[in-house]
Amino acid sequence: MSPVRPRYFTPREVSRHCVLSDLWVSYLGRVYDLTPLLEQHKGDVLLKPIIAAGGRDISHWFNPKTGDVKTHIDPQTGCLKYYTPQGRFLHIAPCFPCSGWDNDFGRPWWKDTIYQVGILSSKTRFIRIINTLTSQEQMLEVCSEETIWEILQRYLAYNAHAASYTWKFCGVPLDMDKTLQENGVQDEDLEFEELKIDADLYTPSIHLYFNDDLTEL
């Protein structure tokens, strides 16, 4: 059995999870749901920087080579310390020796994969999906790494029978197991930006043709 493919998220999706009861962050290309961590340590003042960062990318907190929190030489002690200008947070030791510091927590939360829910897209793009049966159009922001089948899963919110359609671009059926780029749907955002052309005026259109098989999902 092939391994389950991780889910990709857009920064916009991550940003929607920014409250105490539902708090996500992204860092170093991964997306994490820290809600269980907040519940476990409810009321701990060291959660404040984490809560303040809810829904955002915090890659700047970490060293991309080690995956650990950035360090610096403390000017007062001359010792190597974690660098936390946003404020000391959970599982970060105090700057000075402290008898009340409990370091028996095992793996620090930022190294615990139990909180990981997916991968942050390195590049998102907009596409227009046109239902030729109903003439309805839907603009979707998708991840460039997603296959057409995964994009279909996003579109189910607008059409529960999306799998009953043949998906085409410029009249050619799309390979549902390939990405947009692999299907020849080029991402020209960079070229448009260099030419100062509004990319929204040239959003790729995917046309759906009904197969009349009444697929139930």
From Swiss-Prot:
> Matching PROSITE patterns, A to Z?
CYTOCHROME_B5_2
Q: Where is it predominantly found? A: cytoplasm
Superkingdom, taxonomy of origin: Eukaryota
Key words of the record: Cell projection, Cytoplasm, Cytoskeleton, Heme, Iron, Metal-binding
Q: Can you name this protein?
A: Cytochrome b5 domain-containing protein 1
UniProt-recorded Gene Ontology molecular function terms: metal ion binding
Keyword Metal-binding annotated: yes
Query: Which residue intervals define the domain Cytochrome b5 heme-binding in the entry?
Result: 6-72
Places the protein is found: Cytoplasm, Cytoskeleton, Cilium axoneme
Q: Which InterPro entries match?
A: Cyt_B5-like_heme/steroid-bd (IPR001199), Cyt_B5-like_heme/steroid_sf (IPR036400), Cytochrome_b5_domain (IPR052320)
- Quick one: a GO cellular component term? cytoplasm
Q: Which Pfam families is this protein grouped with? A: Cyt-b5
Coiled-coil residues are none
Native source organism of the sequence: Xenopus laevis (African clawed frog)
